[in-house]
């Protein structure tokens, strides 16, 4: 049995060749943040694609709605895949809140992947990333 000795540089090069190539992720290469489809009737605002947006963010619709309603300080309900807000709020404001929710409660702060789970233990909330395994605390709402 003969043993071939490799230099440190050769071993290092071999190890690097076995690692998966790391891609640079540009904003939106893999995940595109959806926008709300909003209509107004009187003093009510309807978000028609609310369930679809919540599913794309991997969050329950009532959780997303609770965040939005607390931020705009208006009452509202979720029914049949549509969110109904009782009050006047612009589509631009709602989409900015959606972007803020994504940055604070969906996107992993370590690897910036959108593949996360929101975990609530007692009074604490965490984001657990399914891509890198990181667990990061977030401000409860």
UniProtKB/Swiss-Prot annotation:
Alphabetized UniProt keyword annotations: Initiation factor, Protein biosynthesis
One Pfam family it belongs to: eIF-5_eIF-2B
GO molecular function ontology, one term from the record: translation initiation factor activity
InterPro entries the UniProt entry points to: IF2/IF5 (IPR045196), TIF2_bsu_arc (IPR004458), Transl_init_fac_IF2/IF5_dom (IPR002735), Transl_init_fac_IF2/IF5_N (IPR016189), Transl_init_fac_IF2/IF5_Zn-bd (IPR016190)
Signal sequence interval, chain numbering: none
Keyword Protein biosynthesis assigned: yes
Superkingdom in the source lineage: Archaea
Keyword match Protein biosynthesis: yes
Family listed: Belongs to the eIF-2-beta/eIF-5 family.
Subunit record text: Heterotrimer composed of an alpha, a beta and a gamma chain.
Function: eIF-2 functions in the early steps of protein synthesis by forming a ternary complex with GTP and initiator tRNA.
Protein name: Translation initiation factor 2 subunit beta
Organism: Thermofilum pendens (strain DSM 2475 / Hrk 5)
Lineage per the UniProt record: Archaea, Thermoproteota, Thermoprotei, Thermofilales, Thermofilaceae
Gene that encodes the chain: eif2b
């Amino acid at each position: 049995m003969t043993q071939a000795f490799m230099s440190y540089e050769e071993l290092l090069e071999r190890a690097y060749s076995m690692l998966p190539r790391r891609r640079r992720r540009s904003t939106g290469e893999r995940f595109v943040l959806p926008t709300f489809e909003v209509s107004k009737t009187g003093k009510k605002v309807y978000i028609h694609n609310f369930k679809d947006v919540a599913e794309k963010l991997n969050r329950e619709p009532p959780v997303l709605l609770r965040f939005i309603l607390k931020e705009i300080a208006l009452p509202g309900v979720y029914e049949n895949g549509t969110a109904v807000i009782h009050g006047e709020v612009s589509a631009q404001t709602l989409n900015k809140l959606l972007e803020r929710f994504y940055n604070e409660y969906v996107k992993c702060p370590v690897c910036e992947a959108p593949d996360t789970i929101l975990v609530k233990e007692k009074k604490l909330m965490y984001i657990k990333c399914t891509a890198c395994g990181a667990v990061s605390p977030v401000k409860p709402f």
